[in-house]
Swiss-Prot record:
GO terms for cellular component: cytosol. HAMAP family: RRF. The gene is frr. It is found in: Cytoplasm. Belongs to the RRF family. InterPro entries: Ribosome_recyc_fac (IPR002661), Ribosome_recyc_fac_dom (IPR023584), RRF_sf (IPR036191). GO terms for molecular function: ribosomal large subunit binding. PANTHER family: MITOCHONDRIAL RIBOSOME RECYCLING FACTOR PSEUDO 1 (PTHR20982:SF3), RIBOSOME RECYCLING FACTOR (PTHR20982). This is Ribosome-recycling factor. GO terms for biological process: cytoplasmic translational termination. Keywords: Cytoplasm, Protein biosynthesis. It comes from the Bacteria. Responsible for the release of ribosomes from messenger RNA at the termination of protein biosynthesis. May increase the efficiency of translation by recycling ribosomes from one round of translation to another.
Amino acid sequence: MINDIKKDADARMKKSVEALNANFHKIRTGRAHPSLLDAVTVEYYGSEMPLNQVASVNVEDARTLAVVPWEKSMVPKVEKAIMTSDLGLNPAAAGNVIRVPLPPLTEETRRNYIKQARGEAENARVAVRNVRRDANGDLKSLLKEKEITEDEERHAIDEIQKLTDKYVTEIDKLLETKEHDLLQV
């Protein structure tokens, strides 16, 4: 029972950190990275598809992405999808290749991205703490039902706290790395 609660808490906390990492990949730094366009969806035969399922996205150089749709007829739709995404990018089609130059980040944009990253990190910390609260509540209910002793409950709560501290530290490290990437010119 206690181990199940700990395993569940660990898995849920890990998912929170993975979600944060995915969100951080959507925040662009000054460098080109294929995952930058992961959030872009394209209308493909009547349904919205992620860009990486209708085209290949490659890094051409440090500030340019090359997007090659698998069907030539998709070039205008892919170009429009990138342009209308809220990433502030202006793609240019050349034949069946769409080049996406990344404008250099202004100081103000960097600050806004850092603020956004800090907000995402705080949301992840809150999610981890909510998992801790749920796990502690489950332990208290087991204690109330006399399925575990007070010592077992106290020990399990300490272990859940250690898990929480571990994942919050991991979140802080991810945030520090992202801030460092954003501040590099």
